[in-house]
Amino acid sequence: MAKAKVKKDQSPCSGSLGKTANTPKQKRKQKQRKFWQNHPKITTKTGETKKVSLLLPPKGPQEFSSNWKALQELLKPKENQALPATTLAKCPKKDQKVSEKKTEESVPQKSGHKINGGITSVSAIAKGAKAPSQATPTKAAEKSDEVSKGKKRKIMAEATDTEHQGKKPQGEAQPQPPKVDIWFDDVDPDDIEAALGPEAGRVAREMQGITDTRSPTVDKILVKERAFEGLTRTVAMDCEMVGVGMDGEESILARVSIVNLFGKCVYDKYVKPTERVTDYRTAVSGIRPEDVKKGEPFKVVQKEVSEILRGRTLVGHAVHNDLKILFLDHPKKAIRDTQKYKPFKQKVKSGRPSLKLLCEKILNVKVQTGEHCSVQDAQAAMRLYTMEKKSWEVAIKAKYTGVMPVDRKSKGPQKDKQCPQ
């Protein structure tokens, strides 16, 4: 007998295993299909950008104007770029995402418009592609609405910040005039003028409420413009003193100023008082307590002045008082004192003429009308010297060398005339 073939049981498990092996791939494919069905924009964008690059140049005037408008919109800075980094950092990311979604939804997705034979979609135009003139006003209106909303948010945020910090008046927001830029606390306007120029000194005096005793005509007469500003072989010095002691009659040094032959200030420093000051003599000296507090030590100033005067001709008015207060000595041959010069005494008709009188009669300039300035006094003494320099030097040479000055008319020594000191 033939053996009957035993049929293998086709269990449901065997069939199910084959099907389950393909299920992950099928699921992936289904997910991909669903993804591309739900997101058709990505495929259209890639194709549309390629089409935009193949656009031909405009032929008609209408197309040219519309493309020009589209190009202007392209060149406009984007909202995110226009906003500063601080404002972008303050805005939360959620608000930015919401605004991006609104912009995408606001632009309708149409099939496209024909431009020079090519087809472009509205989404491509929103990205920066060239669009006809009909679509531009609507986009501009939408953008302006979005920008206005963003500005309103910024204004509200700034208003809340100001409320937390404290309300400030609107007048402070206005830009202040440039005069405030050259305001310095506890700084003498003369120092500001020496460092920054006469205009800065004038503004500083106005801000501090100090009347400027020096007029522009005085500076023009006493100082030579566009001249050498360094040390010369001839210098003029003047000092200001303050009172010490019980009655304030004794004097100590408070300020030293030195100018060159052309009236340019080369040295000007305040000196710290070595004793307790009882009388600052502000009405005459122009010295105030805050000036000498930040001054230099006396020994430092004394050393610096002695180095400047060494080997140079010294000009001044009653210079012996200035040298005495500095505890310095200078050879008489190198001193030119405007108070002791005899031709000046004869012109003014005074045995001990003041510097103010000499300037009024000889230079036709008014100085020392209010508070004294050591720089101006030194400049005035130097100007008086330069006017009589030739005759003065001839007289000094005759005095110390024994050679009498020769009169050009008589061509002989002037025996009768005395040499001025």
UniProtKB/Swiss-Prot annotation:
Location relative to the cell: Nucleus
E.C. number(s) listed in UniProt: 3.1.-.-
Gene Ontology MF terms in the entry: 3'-5' exonuclease activity; exonuclease activity; nucleic acid binding
Pfam family, one: RNase_T
Gene that specifies this protein: rexo4
Any single Gene Ontology cellular-component annotation: nucleus
InterPro entries: Exonuclease_RNaseT/DNA_pol3, REX4_DEDDh_dom, REXO1/3/4-like, RNaseH-like_sf, RNaseH_sf
Keywords from the UniProt entry: Exonuclease, Hydrolase, Nuclease, Nucleus
Enzyme class: hydrolase
Family: Belongs to the REXO4 family.
CDD domains, sorted: REX4_like
Comp. bias intervals (Basic and acidic residues): 92-107, 140-149, 161-170
GO biological process, one term: rRNA processing
Residue ranges, annotated region (Disordered): 1-51, 79-179
Keyword match Zinc-finger: no
Official protein name in the record: RNA exonuclease 4
